[in-house]
C-alpha cells in the first residue's frame, strides 16, 4: 500500500509532496538443493521466498524569485528506503524447502585479493539484502618476520580465529544507501542563466578493495602500490572491516552556464551559447577512487570497490544553438 500528500500554495510557487509505501513480495524465485531421487536433478527453482520494502519519498519545489529580469527555481527530492529479506523457506508440492540463511553474494578475486575467505557482501535472512558480514580487525599486528597483518578479533570467544562464512564475522553495515538525494537549481538574470544538478547517497558503507589489494606488499612489492604501502608493510590478503568505509557523498553532477545573445537579424531568430561540466565535484570522506558505486550512477558492484572500477571522468563541453 502507499499513502501520499500533495500540497501547494502561492500559485504553486511552493509545492510539497510526500509518499509512504510498503510492499511485501512473496513467492520469490530461488534455487534450492533437493534430493536425487525424489527429483531428477539436485537443483530446483521454486517460488518460495519473501521480502519486504518500505520507504518515504519527499519532494520540494520552490520558486523564490520570479520577475521579468530574474528567476530562480529550486527542486529537491529525498528518498528513504528499507528492505528486508524475510524468508527463504516454505513448502513446494507438500515438501519442506529451505535455503541457507547466510549466503555470500559479493566477493573479491584477482591479484592482491586471493587470500581465501574473501566473501564480503551477504544475503542474510532478517536483514536488508546486501549487508557486509565481516571479521572485525582490532588493528595491525607484527608477525615473526616483522611484517604487519590484520589482527582479527575472536568474536565467538572459542579461542580460534575462523574466517569462514559462519565463523568470526558480524554484520558491519549495508551496501545500499538508506537515503538518496537529488536536487536541481536554476537561476536566470536577464540574458544569462545557470543550472546545477546535485545528487547524494547516505547511510551505507563501501568496502575499499582497491586499498586492500594495493597495500599488500607481497603481491605488488615494487610497483602499483599505494603511497603509504611501504610504510604500512602489510603482508595479508584477508578481508575485514579494516577496509570498510563510510560511503556517504554529495556529487555536483552537472553545471551549465548559458547566455542568450540578442540579435537584430531577420534571418536568425535566436542565438544561445553555453558551457557545461559533468561530474564537477564530489564531497566524501571515502578514500578510494570514487564513492559512487552501487548507486544509480554506477550500479554494478554492490558496495565493493574491487580495484577494477574506473572513476567517473569529468567532461567539459560547449554548445551553440541557433534558431532560424
Describe the function of each predicted region.
Residues 63-173, 278, 285-288:
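Conserved small-residue
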Residues 12-16, 56, 67-68, 191-194, ...:
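Repeated loop/turn-to-beta-strand initiation elements of outer-membrane beta-barrel proteins
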Residues 48-53, 100-138, 222, 235-239, ...:
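C-terminal beta-signal and terminal closure region of outer-membrane beta-barrel proteins
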Residues 17, 21-66, 139, 168-173:
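Outer membrane beta-barrel strand-and-loop segments of large Gram-negative receptors
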Residues 142-144, 199-280, 285, 292-294, ...:
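Extracytoplasmic gating/loop element in the C-terminal half of outer-membrane beta-barrel translocons
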Residues 3-7, 18, 58-62, 183-189, ...:
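Residues on the lipid-exposed face of transmembrane beta-strands in outer-membrane beta-barrel proteins
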Residues 20-26, 62-64, 78-84, 189-191, ...:
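Transmembrane beta-strands of outer-membrane beta-barrel pores
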Residues 28-32, 70, 80-104, 204-228, ...:
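Outer-membrane beta-barrel and related beta-rich outer-membrane complex signature
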Amino acid at each position: 500500500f502507499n499513502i501520499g500528500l500533495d500540497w501547494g500554495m502561492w500559485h504553486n510557487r511552493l509545492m510539497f509532496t510526500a509518499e509512504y509505501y510498503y510492499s511485501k513480495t512473496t513467492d520469490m524465485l530461488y534455487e534450492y538443493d533437493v534430493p536425487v531421487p525424489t527429483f531428477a536433478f539436485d537443483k530446483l527453482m521454486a517460488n518460495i521466498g519473501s521480502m519486504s520494502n518500505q520507504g518515504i519519498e519527499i519532494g520540494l519545489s520552490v520558486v523564490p524569485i520570479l520577475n521579468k529580469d530574474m528567476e530562480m527555481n529550486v527542486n529537491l527530492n529525498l528518498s528513504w528506503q528499507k528492505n528486508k529479506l524475510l524468508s527463504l523457506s516454505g513448502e513446494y508440492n507438500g515438501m519442506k524447502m529451505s535455503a541457507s540463511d547466510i549466503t555470500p553474494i559479493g566477493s573479491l578475486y584477482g591479484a592482491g585479493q586471493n587470500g581465501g575467505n574473501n566473501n564480503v557482501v551477504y544475503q542474510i535472512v532478517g536483514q536488508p539484502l546486501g549487508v557486509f558480514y565481516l571479521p572485525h580487525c582490532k588493528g595491525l599486528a607484527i608477525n615473526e618476520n616483522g611484517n604487519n597483518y590484520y589482527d582479527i578479533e575472536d568474536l565467538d570467544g572459542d579461542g580460534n580465529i575462523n574466517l569462514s562464512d559462519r565463523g568470526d564475522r558480524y554484520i558491519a553495515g549495508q551496501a545500499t544507501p538508506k537515503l538518496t538525494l537529488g536536487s536541481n537549481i536554476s537561476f536566470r538574470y536577464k540574458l544569462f542563466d545557470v543550472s546545477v544538478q546535485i545528487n547524494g547517497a547516505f547511510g551505507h558503507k563501501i568496502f575499499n578493495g582497491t586499498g586492500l589489494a594495493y597495500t599488500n606488499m607481497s603481491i605488488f612489492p615494487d610497483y602499483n602500490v599505494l603511497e603509504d604501502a611501504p610504510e604500512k608493510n602489510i603482508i595479508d590478503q584477508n578481508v575485514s572491516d579494516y577496509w570498510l568505509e563510510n560511503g556517504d557523498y554529495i556529487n555536483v553532477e552537472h553545471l551549465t552556464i548559458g547566455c542568450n545573445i540578442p540579435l537584430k537579424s531577420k534571418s536568425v531568430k535566436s542565438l544561445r551559447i553555453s558551457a557545461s561540466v559533468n561530474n564537477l565535484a564530489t564531497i566524501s570522506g571515502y578514500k578510494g577512487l570514487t564513492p559512487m558505486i552501487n548507486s544509480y550512477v554506477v550500479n554494478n558492484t554492490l558496495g565493493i570497490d574491487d580495484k577494477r572500477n574506473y572513476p567517473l571522468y569529468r567532461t567539459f563541453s560547449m554548445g551553440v544553438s541557433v534558431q532560424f
